[in-house]
């Protein structure tokens, strides 16, 4: 019987009707696996050993239920991470210093024999915005800088751009700028904090009106359906957290080419689960911290993404 520890946000905060971590847990519980939960802030090192204040939990019913308690937890027990068959890091960004420290502890735990997914090293190496620079043939014209003057030059060259912080999530802090925007100066000052914060700028991709696509890669294999996240009217962000609407669709063409090119490289780097974001024919992000979209694809297309993930965890935990 597998013992799996989830490092995740408080379980009482889960929106069970759409939460991907919840879907993972449900599938593993169906298989009879023993499940445990901890917070990233409950990791510690004692006597050189990486441990967590972990609590075993079980489901109280067979259905998603946001209105009532859906789980029952036992008391927390300080447990070495190496005692679990798999440790799954599912804490949401931002990737701040606390997140960085957690990944460093996870790397130490891996050296002690723990099986961590995604690995601490992979999460540090793959900034979700900067990672696309490793795959330049799939991306739109892109600038990374701390200098607002560089952004102004880039804007003049392309006329219509998107700027975003490197540590955001859910569409937070993303702005669209055109040359005629009267607020260019104030937006750059706010986002770049007077040239002290590194940001990414990209040429605006007009296909965003049809949605950006979340493509999932699990254990080096491509999920055959993408989740198109379509912006609300008047929005430039398709993120579900920003009010976008998720529509599952079959993967094909350029989207499949991008996914199948990245899949073996992500596997080589120890990334069990990744979510690629694609707008039009352009790769815009590689999400490795806490990719979502499982439940939307499962409900709309009947493809069991959670089962595919659990299969991969079982296989990778004995590698």
Curated annotation (Swiss-Prot):
<comment type="similarity">
    <text>Belongs to the prokaryotic GSH synthase family.</text>
</comment>
<dbReference type="InterPro" id="IPR011761">
    <property type="entry name" value="ATP-grasp"/>
</dbReference>
<keyword id="KW-0464">Manganese</keyword>
<dbReference type="GO" id="GO:0005524">
    <property type="term" value="F:ATP binding"/>
</dbReference>
<keyword id="KW-0547">Nucleotide-binding</keyword>
<dbReference type="GO" id="GO:0005737">
    <property type="term" value="C:cytoplasm"/>
</dbReference>
<dbReference type="Pfam" id="PF02951">
    <property type="entry name" value="GSH-S_N"/>
</dbReference>
<dbReference type="GO" id="GO:0004363">
    <property type="term" value="F:glutathione synthase activity"/>
</dbReference>
<dbReference type="InterPro" id="IPR004215">
    <property type="entry name" value="GSHS_N"/>
</dbReference>
<keyword id="KW-0436">Ligase</keyword>
<feature type="binding site">
    <location>
        <begin position="155"/>
        <end position="211"/>
    </location>
    <ligand>
        <name>ATP</name>
    </ligand>
</feature>
<keyword id="KW-0317">Glutathione biosynthesis</keyword>
<dbReference type="InterPro" id="IPR006284">
    <property type="entry name" value="Glut_synth_pro"/>
</dbReference>
<protein>
    <recommendedName>
        <fullName>Glutathione synthetase</fullName>
        <ecNumber>6.3.2.3</ecNumber>
    </recommendedName>
</protein>
<dbReference type="InterPro" id="IPR016185">
    <property type="entry name" value="PreATP-grasp_dom_sf"/>
</dbReference>
<dbReference type="InterPro" id="IPR013815">
    <property type="entry name" value="ATP_grasp_subdomain_1"/>
</dbReference>
<keyword id="KW-0460">Magnesium</keyword>
<dbReference type="GO" id="GO:0046872">
    <property type="term" value="F:metal ion binding"/>
</dbReference>
<comment type="pathway">
    <text>Sulfur metabolism; glutathione biosynthesis; glutathione from L-cysteine and L-glutamate: step 2/2.</text>
</comment>
<dbReference type="InterPro" id="IPR004218">
    <property type="entry name" value="GSHS_ATP-bd"/>
</dbReference>
<keyword id="KW-0479">Metal-binding</keyword>
<feature type="domain" description="ATP-grasp">
    <location>
        <begin position="129"/>
        <end position="314"/>
    </location>
</feature>
<keyword id="KW-0067">ATP-binding</keyword>
<dbReference type="Pfam" id="PF02955">
    <property type="entry name" value="GSH-S_ATP"/>
</dbReference>
<feature type="binding site">
    <location>
        <position position="287"/>
    </location>
    <ligand>
        <name>Mg(2+)</name>
    </ligand>
</feature>
<feature type="binding site">
    <location>
        <position position="285"/>
    </location>
    <ligand>
        <name>Mg(2+)</name>
    </ligand>
</feature>
